[in-house]
UniProtKB/Swiss-Prot annotation:
One of its GO terms (biological process) is removal of superoxide radicals. Its EC number is 1.7.-.-, 1.11.1.-. This is Myoglobin. Residues 2-141 form the Globin domain. The lineage of its organism: Eukaryota, Metazoa, Chordata, Craniata, Vertebrata.
Length: 147
């Protein structure tokens, strides 16, 4: 619980502008981990330099952060929220678990820069994301999805 609360203390600026922060997160993910872009076929035709200004990238980034906000606010009681996300990402989108670890690190960097998440907050976010990702991985296994 303490980790969730620590992250939520810095969530306000992110929540106030999911679109901008979401664009920053996805653009940075695609820059630092170019292999992740292939997991988003709808962005395939967008030049790398145009990703940051693309409305579709911003909208998807906003969706990611909005869902993460819901998971954070559940403070660990997130099974009902997480199951449908796990299901769609395993069966429809076929997203390997490692990619959630990559985006979690990027979210931490963006929150440090834009929302004041300090070193203790970074550790708290890593702990929170480790729990969420482990639960997703368990859901993936139930669904028979292995990378």
């Amino acid at each position: 619980m303490a980790d969730f609360d620590m992250v939520l203390k810095c969530w306000g600026p992110v929540e106030a502008d999911y679109t901008t922060h979401g664009s920053l997160v996805l653009t940075r993910l695609f820059t630092e981990h170019p292999e992740t872009l292939k997991l988003f076929p709808k962005f395939a035709g967008i030049a790398h330099g145009d990703l940051a200004g693309d409305a579709g990238v911003s909208a998807h980034g906003a969706t990611v952060l909005n869902k993460l906000g819901d998971l954070l606010k559940a403070r660990g009681a997130h099974a009902a929220l997480l199951k449908p996300l796990s299901s769609s990402h395993a069966t429809k989108h076929k997203i390997p678990i490692i990619n959630f670890k990559l985006i979690a690190e990027v979210i931490g960097k963006v929150m440090e820069e834009k929302a004041g998440l300090d070193a203790a907050g970074q550790t708290a976010l890593r702990n929170v994301m480790a729990v969420i990702i482990a639960d997703m991985e368990a859901d993936y296994k139930e669904l028979g999805f292995t990378e």
